[in-house]
Swiss-Prot record:
Name of the protein: Transmembrane protein 164
Transmembrane parts of this sequence: 40-60, 93-113, 133-153, 171-191, 223-243
The protein's role, per its UniProt record: Positive regulator of ferroptosis.
Lineage: superkingdom: Eukaryota
One GO cellular component term: membrane
Gene name of this polypeptide: TMEM164
Family: Belongs to the TMEM164 family.
Length: 258
């Protein structure tokens, strides 16, 4: 009985992953890189990731001590405390409901297609087949990845961003991302032969396709995620004036009473 339950669990986890599709996984995908190269890349990237985390934490802890002694801290001047902070708002609750529903539908699709293991992917790579509306959910979820951070940063409070010139929170985030990929995702991918976020072999459309695709992708993602994060902060600064402009634009003129 226990063995049957274990087999059922594994079937739910990755039984629906079809290795016949290029980039999904399988023995050939798992053997794309030699174990020597895979080990070397893992040691180098994990070491750099830990260094990023430790260096950033050192600066963050030092800044925290300075703030405790009355320092100005790293809060940007243009972000101020809002009087409505701490109060529930309709827009925030609606956004929370939309995000929960989207994630719930995504989890349901993963169980229905027996690809639950893909929930471990930072960006859910799905086959977009078998069930209706899965393609739409894919894009809705990724649009929410933009809407939610910008909205929370615009609201301020605990979600106040760091200054554009500071990278003390961007560094540990990048380090944790690579540590997660080269430890948890890679180990699970090798055990299950499922290509989780392309840690076993490159996608067929990968611009860095080749034996060193992970090294090229690591450098590219470091640059792009940090640049992208700063752009999100800029958009959060613009969200307030833009929303006010759109509301004024859509507001109907008051009816004149004689």
């Amino acid at each position: 009985m226990s063995r049957y339950s274990y087999q059922s669990l594994l079937d739910w986890l990755y039984g629906g992953v079809d290795p016949s599709f290029a980039g999904n996984g399988g023995p050939d995908c798992a053997a794309f890189l030699s174990w020597q190269q895979r080990l070397l890349e893992s040691v180098v990237v994990l070491t750099l990731a830990l260094l990023e985390i430790l260096v950033a934490l050192r600066h963050i802890l030092r800044q925290t001590k300075e703030d405790g002694r009355g320092g100005r801290g790293c809060q940007p001047e243009q972000v101020t405390q809002r009087p409505e902070e701490g109060k529930e708002s309709l827009s925030k609750n609606l956004l929370l409901v939309a995000l929960c529903l989207t994630f719930g539908v995504e989890v349901g699709f993963k169980f229905a297609t027996k690809t639950v293991i893909y929930l471990l992917n930072p960006c859910h790579l799905v086959t977009m087949m078998h069930l209706p509306f899965e393609l739409e959910i894919y894009y809705i979820q990724h649009v929410m990845l933009y809407v939610v951070p910008i909205y929370l940063l615009w609201k301020g409070g605990a979600y106040t961003p760091e200054p554009l010139s500071s990278f003390r929170w961007a560094l540990p985030s990048t380090g944790l991302m690579f540590f997660y990929h080269f430890s948890i995702l890679q180990i699970l991918g090798l055990v299950t032969e499922v290509n989780l976020n392309n840690m076993l072999c490159p996608a067929i459309s990968d611009p860095f396709y080749g034996p060193w695709y992970r090294i090229w992708a690591s450098g590219h993602q470091t640059l792009m995620t940090m640049t992208h994060g700063k752009l999100v902060i800029l958009f959060s600064y613009m969200a307030g004036p833009l929303c006010k402009y759109l509301l004024d634009l859509l507001r109907l003129p008051a009816k004149k009473i004689d």
